[in-house]
């Protein structure tokens, strides 16, 4: 299983003081050095952490895979096509939320989704949708032209250990199996941490996990390099 490191909260920490440090690009390079298979950043409409300049610098610096999370807006479509990350991930976005609260509502947006994705398909930029682990959403993602799905693991992360968490893990497993049967690549993310990630090693259909907050929080105490290496030790 591969690890993609989300460096948004490096920028959050920097922006808390309006300074230049810590530098998210430096964090991205260190993550790659430690063995991360990709770097994830979310260019939100309000630019609350990563900004346009960060994105441009990340594109120049990242040599593994740059995954740009973004809302489905015309402005961000143009920015993404100009920047040319290896992958874009469409996510829902609410200005009042602290972090992404759920999967992309593909049923609601399906009528316009395929047309929105076509320029990315034509440009050779892979497309992922951050969705709930549900078969209908996966089917629609495939039909709309997605190459990957990122399964939302937030509900799993919120469950206490026991039957409820096991049930949610099984739902994710079944969704991953279904997605792979359609030829989609599968990623998982949201709320995953050092204590709850281990069971995902048993779901072979999930090729990669995307983790940010847990790693950055651990890095405050142990350093970023050790925080990343510790996560890699758990998932390998």
Swiss-Prot record:
<feature type="binding site">
    <location>
        <position position="17"/>
    </location>
    <ligand>
        <name>3-amino-2-oxopropyl phosphate</name>
    </ligand>
</feature>
<dbReference type="InterPro" id="IPR013785">
    <property type="entry name" value="Aldolase_TIM"/>
</dbReference>
<feature type="binding site">
    <location>
        <position position="44"/>
    </location>
    <ligand>
        <name>1-deoxy-D-xylulose 5-phosphate</name>
    </ligand>
</feature>
<comment type="pathway">
    <text>Cofactor biosynthesis; pyridoxine 5'-phosphate biosynthesis; pyridoxine 5'-phosphate from D-erythrose 4-phosphate: step 5/5.</text>
</comment>
<keyword id="KW-0808">Transferase</keyword>
<feature type="binding site">
    <location>
        <position position="6"/>
    </location>
    <ligand>
        <name>3-amino-2-oxopropyl phosphate</name>
    </ligand>
</feature>
<comment type="function">
    <text>Catalyzes the complicated ring closure reaction between the two acyclic compounds 1-deoxy-D-xylulose-5-phosphate (DXP) and 3-amino-2-oxopropyl phosphate (1-amino-acetone-3-phosphate or AAP) to form pyridoxine 5'-phosphate (PNP) and inorganic phosphate.</text>
</comment>
<keyword id="KW-0664">Pyridoxine biosynthesis</keyword>
<feature type="binding site">
    <location>
        <position position="191"/>
    </location>
    <ligand>
        <name>3-amino-2-oxopropyl phosphate</name>
    </ligand>
</feature>
<comment type="subunit">
    <text>Homooctamer; tetramer of dimers.</text>
</comment>
<feature type="binding site">
    <location>
        <position position="49"/>
    </location>
    <ligand>
        <name>1-deoxy-D-xylulose 5-phosphate</name>
    </ligand>
</feature>
<feature type="active site" description="Proton donor">
    <location>
        <position position="190"/>
    </location>
</feature>
<feature type="binding site">
    <location>
        <begin position="212"/>
        <end position="213"/>
    </location>
    <ligand>
        <name>3-amino-2-oxopropyl phosphate</name>
    </ligand>
</feature>
<dbReference type="GO" id="GO:0008615">
    <property type="term" value="P:pyridoxine biosynthetic process"/>
</dbReference>
<keyword id="KW-0963">Cytoplasm</keyword>
<feature type="active site" description="Proton acceptor">
    <location>
        <position position="42"/>
    </location>
</feature>
<comment type="similarity">
    <text>Belongs to the PNP synthase family.</text>
</comment>
<feature type="binding site">
    <location>
        <position position="99"/>
    </location>
    <ligand>
        <name>1-deoxy-D-xylulose 5-phosphate</name>
    </ligand>
</feature>
<dbReference type="InterPro" id="IPR036130">
    <property type="entry name" value="Pyridoxine-5'_phos_synth"/>
</dbReference>
<feature type="site" description="Transition state stabilizer">
    <location>
        <position position="150"/>
    </location>
</feature>
<dbReference type="GO" id="GO:0033856">
    <property type="term" value="F:pyridoxine 5'-phosphate synthase activity"/>
</dbReference>
<dbReference type="Pfam" id="PF03740">
    <property type="entry name" value="PdxJ"/>
</dbReference>
<dbReference type="GO" id="GO:0005829">
    <property type="term" value="C:cytosol"/>
</dbReference>
<dbReference type="InterPro" id="IPR004569">
    <property type="entry name" value="PyrdxlP_synth_PdxJ"/>
</dbReference>
<feature type="binding site">
    <location>
        <begin position="8"/>
        <end position="9"/>
    </location>
    <ligand>
        <name>1-deoxy-D-xylulose 5-phosphate</name>
    </ligand>
</feature>
<feature type="active site" description="Proton acceptor">
    <location>
        <position position="69"/>
    </location>
</feature>
<protein>
    <recommendedName>
        <fullName>Pyridoxine 5'-phosphate synthase</fullName>
        <ecNumber>2.6.99.2</ecNumber>
    </recommendedName>
</protein>
């Amino acid at each position: 299983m591969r690890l993609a490191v989300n460096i948004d909260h490096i920028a959050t920490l920097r922006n808390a003081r309006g300074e230049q440090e810590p530098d998210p690009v430096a964090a991205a390079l260190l993550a790659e050095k430690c063995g991360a298979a990709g770097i994830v950043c979310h260019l939100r409409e309000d630019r609350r952490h990563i900004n346009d300049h960060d994105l441009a610098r990340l594109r120049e610096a990242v040599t593994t895979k740059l995954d740009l999370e973004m809302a489905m807006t015309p402005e961000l479509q143009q920015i993404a096509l100009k920047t040319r990350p290896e992958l874009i991930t469409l996510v829902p976005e609410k200005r009042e939320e602290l972090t992404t609260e759920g999967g992309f509502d593909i049923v609601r947006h399906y009528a316009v989704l395929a047309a929105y994705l076509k320029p990315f398909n034509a440009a050779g930029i892979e497309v992922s949708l951050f969705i709930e682990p549900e078969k209908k959403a996966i089917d629609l993602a495939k039909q709309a032209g997605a190459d990957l799905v990122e399964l939302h693991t937030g509900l799993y992360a919120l469950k206490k250990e026991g039957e409820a968490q096991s049930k949610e893990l099984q739902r994710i497993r079944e969704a991953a199996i279904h997605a792979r049967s359609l030829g989609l690549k599968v990623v998982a993310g949201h709320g995953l941490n050092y204590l709850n990630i281990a069971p995902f090693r048993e779901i072979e259909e999930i090729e990669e996990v995307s983790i940010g907050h847990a790693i950055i929080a651990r890095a405050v105490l142990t350093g970023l390099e050790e925080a990343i290496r510790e996560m890699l030790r758990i998932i390998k």
